[in-house]
Amino acid sequence: IIPITIAAFAAYAFAFMEFRGKEPLFLLVVASMIIPLQMSLIPLVQLFKSGVEVFGLPIIPALDINGAFVATWFAHSGFGLPLATFLLRDFMMSLPRSVIESAKIDGASNMTTFFKLVLPLSVAGIAAFATFQFLWVYNDFLVANVFLGVYKPENLVVTSHVSQLAVGAYGEAWHLRTSGAIISMIVPLTVFFSLQRFFIRGLIGGAVKG
C-alpha cells in the first residue's frame, strides 16, 4: 500500500506535470532499480539502528527499529517504490492526453484531475503492480529474515516456520512440511485470481479510448 500510494502521485507528476529537473529525477528513479537489493541491506540495517550523521550533525535520527515490523515496511516500500513509479508512469502516459487537457481547460486542478480522471483510469495498472508487490513481499525471505529473524526469532517468516515443522522419529516429517507449504499458497492464489482481470489489463498497458 505504501509504495503504491506514493508512486501513484509521483507517476502523475512525471507523466503530466512540468517542473525543473523532471527528466534527471526520473532517470535517478530508473537508475535506482539497477542497484542490487543485497547491496543495500547492510546500509539499511545501520541506518535503522544508528541513523545518519554528517560532520557530527544528525541528519536522520537513530530509530532503532531493527527487529520490528516497521523496518520491513520501510525496506519493502523503498525497494518497490522505483519499480512502481516507473510502471505507473508508463501506464499513465498511455492514457489519452485529450481527456487530461480538457480537464485543465475546464479549470480542474492537478489534485482534481488525479483523483477524478487519472486514478480511475489507472485502476488496472495499480492492481497489476499491487499483485506483483504482494506476491514479492509474501514470498520474500531475505529482507524479512534480515530485519526480523536475526533480532527476534519469534518473528520468522512463513518460509522459515514451514522448514522448521516437527521432525519425525526417524527423520523429517515431510507430510507436515508439504501440507504447510500448500496451505501457505492459499493466500497468494486467492489474491492473484481475485485481481486477475485487472492484472491482465494492466500488463497490456492501458488501451483506453477517449
Residue positions per predicted region:
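A structural signal for multi-pass alpha-helical bundles of membrane permease subunits
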Residues: 1-210
